[in-house]
């Protein structure tokens, strides 16, 4: 499928696969509880874990992130350029749905400059949920064909290439800089 078709599927609260910096991600509209539930069911992922959101700019995260709790130094770190994709755990607004935050009062976000992510966010007007496109026990998909093999030939997948990163993103707490996952 092309970008416009994937954007239409996202607006219709479907779960789609799209390329990120290193692997294909499974994504949906983060403001749709039914779409997120489909995603969690597909991944067999407990809601308590929370989800990562990706977007090309901070504006897409404004509905979810409590920017009043982020100081200038942290904001600079959040917007920094790093040699590997970096996901940051940041304070969530009290209105951010639990189906995104899980058992936490924070949310994971990643500024992503992959052209596919940028285009899909601009076409839909929202950030995307991002969890690796793979079934439990299977390796993350790095091509659209691998996505179809794991999820079926009819699964909505954006036919574009992943970026040059070799590993999924590093995950750090923005306030403490604590490393949760090595990238």
UniProtKB/Swiss-Prot annotation:
Keyword Nucleotidyltransferase in annotation: yes
Keyword DNA repair in annotation: no
Domain YrdC-like: start-end pairs: 1-183
Catalytic activity: L-threonine + hydrogencarbonate + ATP = L-threonylcarbamoyladenylate + diphosphate + H2O
Gene Ontology BP annotations: regulation of translational fidelity; tRNA threonylcarbamoyladenosine modification
Enzyme class: transferase
Highest taxon listed in the record's lineage: Bacteria
SUPFAM superfamilies: YrdC/RibB
EC assignment: 2.7.7.87
Single GO MF descriptor: nucleotidyltransferase activity
GO CC entries: cytoplasm
Protein function: Required for the formation of a threonylcarbamoyl group on adenosine at position 37 (t(6)A37) in tRNAs that read codons beginning with adenine. Catalyzes the conversion of L-threonine, HCO(3)(-)/CO(2) and ATP to give threonylcarbamoyl-AMP (TC-AMP) as the acyladenylate intermediate, with the release of diphosphate.
Similarity-based family: Belongs to the SUA5 family. TsaC subfamily.
PANTHER family, sorted: SUA5, THREONYLCARBAMOYL-AMP SYNTHASE
Name of this chain's protein: Threonylcarbamoyl-AMP synthase
Organism: Haemophilus influenzae (strain ATCC 51907 / DSM 11121 / KW20 / Rd)
């Amino acid at each position: 499928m092309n970008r416009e078709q994937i954007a239409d599927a996202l607006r219709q609260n479907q779960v789609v696969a799209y390329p990120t910096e290193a692997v294909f991600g499974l994504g949906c509209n983060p403001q749709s509880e039914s779409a997120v539930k489909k995603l969690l069911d597909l991944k067999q992922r407990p809601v308590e874990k929370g989800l990562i959101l990706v977007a090309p700019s901070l504006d897409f995260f404004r509905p979810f992130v409590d920017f009043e709790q982020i100081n200038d130094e942290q904001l600079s770190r959040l917007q920094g350029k790093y040699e590997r994709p970096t996901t940051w755990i940041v304070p969530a607004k009290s209105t951010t749905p639990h189906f995104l935050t899980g058992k936490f009062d924070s949310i994971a976000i990643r500024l992503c400059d992959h052209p596919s992510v940028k285009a899909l966010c601009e076409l839909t007007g929202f950030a995307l949920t991002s969890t690796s496109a793979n079934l439990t026990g299977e390796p993350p998909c790095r091509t659209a064909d691998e996505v179809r093999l794991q999820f079926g030939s009819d699964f909505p997948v954006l036919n574009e290439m992943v970026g040059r990163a070799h590993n999924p993103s590093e995950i750090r707490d923005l306030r403490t800089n604590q490393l949760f996952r090595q990238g």
